[in-house]
Amino acid sequence: HLVQNKDQPIRLIDIREKEELVTGYIEGAVFAPNSIVKIRPEEFLPEKDTPLVLYCTSGRRSLATAKMLKGMGYIDVVSMAGGFNAWIEAGYRFKTDGTMDQEQIKRYSRQILMHEIKEEGQQKLLKARVLIVGAGGLGCPTGLYLASAGVGTIGIVDFDRVGLSNIHRQVLHATADIGRPKTDSAKNAILRINPEVNIVTFEQRFTPDNALDIIKDFDVVIEGSDNFETKFLLNDAAFLSGKPYIFGGAVRFDGQASVFYPKGGGPCLRC
C-alpha cells in the first residue's frame, strides 16, 4: 500500500464505498470508505505526516475529502485527478475480485455501480437469452440497447430485407445494407456495438408451425412486429411456454409497451 516516489513513500487510499469496488481497485491501495473517513479518519489514517493520495470513482469526492483532511492537520494529502475512471482509461493495471474480466468491468462499469444492478445483476444479463421478433422500428433499438447492456444471447426473427424507406427509423440498418436480410444487417450492427454478444438469427416468418420451436431456448420474448397476427401468435407461444412476453407497438407519435407473464400471476395479451 505504499507507492514509491523519489522523496518518500506515498500511501494510496481508496475512499470509495464497498459496493463500488466491484468495478475493480488499484492493487496495494488501502480501502478506507469515505463515509467513515469523514467521521473517524484516524481509524484508517493514524499518521498525519505520511503523504497520501486519495482516489474515488471520478476524483470529485476524493478532492473534497483531501481538502477536509488538510483542514484536520494532515500535512501532505492530494486527490488523484480523474479518479479510478481515469486510471482505467489510461490503461493501468487493476484488480477485480468478481468473475467478470477487466474488459467486461470497463464496458459495464457505469451500470454496475447502480444499486439495482451491481455485479449480480450484470451476471444475470450476461447469462440472459432474449428473443426479438421483428428487426424493424421496434426491434432495432431494442436490440441495440440490450446488446449495449450486456445481454449474453439475442435472437432475431425477421424474413424481410432492408429497404431505403426503413433506414430513417430502423437504427441497426444503414444505406449499405439495402437489399440484405434484416437479420444479417442487425447482427452485424450489434456485433459492432458489442462483439461479446451471441447473436442467433432466424431469417424466416414467425408462424404457428415454428413459433414454439423458435422461442424454446430463450428466457424472454420481445415482440417488435408490425401486425396484430404476429403479436397474438407470440403471446400464445409465450403463454404455452411459460415465458415472459414483452409487447410493443408504435403508430406515428403514439406507442405502447407492456409485460405479460401469466405464469407469474398476470394476464396475457388476449385477457
Regions found by a protein language model. Name each.
Residues H1-R11, K18-V53, T57-Q123:
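Rhodanese-like catalytic fold shared by cysteine-dependent sulfurtransferases
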